[in-house]
Amino acid sequence: MEKWYLMTVVVLIGLTVRWTVSLNSYSGAGKPPMFGDYEAQRHWQEITFNLPVKQWYFNSSDNNLQYWGLDYPPPTAYHSLLCAYVAKFINPDWIALHTSRGYESQAHKLFMRTTVLIADLLIYIPAVVLYCCCLKEISTKKKIANALCILLYPGLILIDYGHFQYNSVSLGFALWGVLGISCDCDLLGSLAFCLAINYKQMELYHALPFFCFLLGKCFKKGLKGKGFVLLVKLACIVVASFVLCWLPFFTEREQTLQVLRRLFPVDRGLFEDKVANIWCSFNVFLKIKDILPRHIQLIMSFCFTFLSLLPACIKLILQPSSKGFKFTLVSCALSFFLFSFQVHEKSILLVSLPVCLVLSEIPFMSTWFLLVSTFSMLPLLLKDELLMPSVVTTMAFFIACVTSFSIFEKTSEEELQLKSFSISVRKYLPCFTFLSRIIQYLFLISVITMVLLTLMTVTLGPPQKLPDLFSVLVCFVSCLNFLFFLVYFNIIIVWDSKSGRNQKKIS
């Protein structure tokens, strides 16, 4: 009884922080003609309510795709339509065709913020609570502390409740998928993850680990018996869920193709804006976006992404385990973020979710990563006038992690899950006994650099000849950190010889 009382308090704390952040500015507030993501979400409500389904993804006089045209899968459009019906009931002016463009008011802001909170309450927060309650071999106190830290992760709060998006929906469905598969409810887990992909196509970052883990399970059961039956059932679930989600758009071939063109805009190029991945960082030294033809950029990004995630995926197929599954989710999502085509700065949230899931296992490294992930979005958050909420929520999250997990005491090779790797290295370099000390120093350097760059960005004006200097530095420093984490998580995956035994049921 006490556990549920404390968990309720944790949820209320998470909701309070979310609503407090929502009182601040949002993307594109008072900035015509394009405004920002807030207007994009409102505009999608306008389009889905006033136009027939067949026109949602097509350019027309009533639906200018250059002005925040729909570029997410059908379930996102259905969600917008549902919100539009509620908006119509409250104030029809909010979704009036054409005349509502750029609509802003305190009442409308309250409505929009409430839709995010309701989605969070229905999908993401219950998944977090259940996940933490299902963790094995840790105390009730640690389960509650884990839930608190996950719910206080500033990156997701600042983007959904500050900038304005509905990332908690797709991430929540993905988490339900992780829960289902980790508890051997493979069909329900697969259904939940299909809903995640069909809500936001960026959930493809997590698709390979789901596929490899389930395939490994099928191999383990035997493809001539129970494994084959499971494989057929999984295939039926995937096909059925996609057909149901896309049914209105399967009536005509051109409808399906147009939606796909909107979901995967290859014409936009390798990257947009300032994002903390390899291509944007490397572009500072060599303008690969201008030098290489677009099809070469596409092939290059595919090759780098595929090669970087291959070892983890092979290991997961050969040795399927819940622990390996979660770490492979981190590794694959990070590979996609660093090397894939058309990455946005907010896509780092797709890496942050699985990192949150291993917070209780490697608290020091997880906390560090989640701090860097929030810092990597600094240029976007400053543009949205969210500096103060960013600082306060980041400090609150850091304090929660330090007090809950004593992270500075969890830096030994064993706590960092690097003991097997260190033993292997010491066979050739007996003097290699300082790995944990190196990581502590790297953490210190990383945090100091992030603090200094934040202060410089806020207090100093960039040189006239280099107006994007601080934004580029933020991306470059974040990218270096992410490369280090990619190596680290792959080391854990490859050198983990106990993934199939002595593991926790969920964690």
Swiss-Prot record:
Its EC number is 2.4.1.267. It is a multi-pass membrane protein. Disulfide bonds: none annotated. Pathway: Protein modification; protein glycosylation. GO terms for molecular function: dolichyl pyrophosphate Man9GlcNAc2 alpha-1,3-glucosyltransferase activity. The chain crosses the membrane at residues 4-24, 115-135, 144-164, 173-193, 227-247, 298-318, 324-344, 362-382, 388-408, 438-458, 474-494. One of its GO terms (biological process) is dolichol-linked oligosaccharide biosynthetic process. It catalyses: an alpha-D-Man-(1->2)-alpha-D-Man-(1->2)-alpha-D-Man-(1->3)-[alpha-D-Man-(1->2)-alpha-D-Man-(1->3)-[alpha-D-Man-(1->2)-alpha-D-Man-(1->6)]-alpha-D-Man-(1->6)]-beta-D-Man-(1->4)-beta-D-GlcNAc-(1->4)-alpha-D-GlcNAc-diphospho-di-trans,poly-cis-dolichol + a di-trans,poly-cis-dolichyl beta-D-glucosyl phosphate = an alpha-D-Glc-(1->3)-alpha-D-Man-(1->2)-alpha-D-Man-(1->2)-alpha-D-Man-(1->3)-[alpha-D-Man-(1->2)-alpha-D-Man-(1->3)-[alpha-D-Man-(1->2)-alpha-D-Man-(1->6)]-alpha-D-Man-(1->6)]-beta-D-Man-(1->4)-beta-D-GlcNAc-(1->4)-alpha-D-GlcNAc-diphospho-di-trans,poly-cis-dolichol + a di-trans,poly-cis-dolichyl phosphate + H(+). Dolichyl pyrophosphate Man9GlcNAc2 alpha-1,3-glucosyltransferase that operates in the biosynthetic pathway of dolichol-linked oligosaccharides, the glycan precursors employed in protein asparagine (N)-glycosylation. The assembly of dolichol-linked oligosaccharides begins on the cytosolic side of the endoplasmic reticulum membrane and finishes in its lumen. The sequential addition of sugars to dolichol pyrophosphate produces dolichol-linked oligosaccharides containing fourteen sugars, including two GlcNAcs, nine mannoses and three glucoses. This is Dolichyl pyrophosphate Man9GlcNAc2 alpha-1,3-glucosyltransferase. It comes from Pongo abelii. The lineage of its organism: Eukaryota, Metazoa, Chordata, Craniata, Vertebrata. The gene is ALG6.
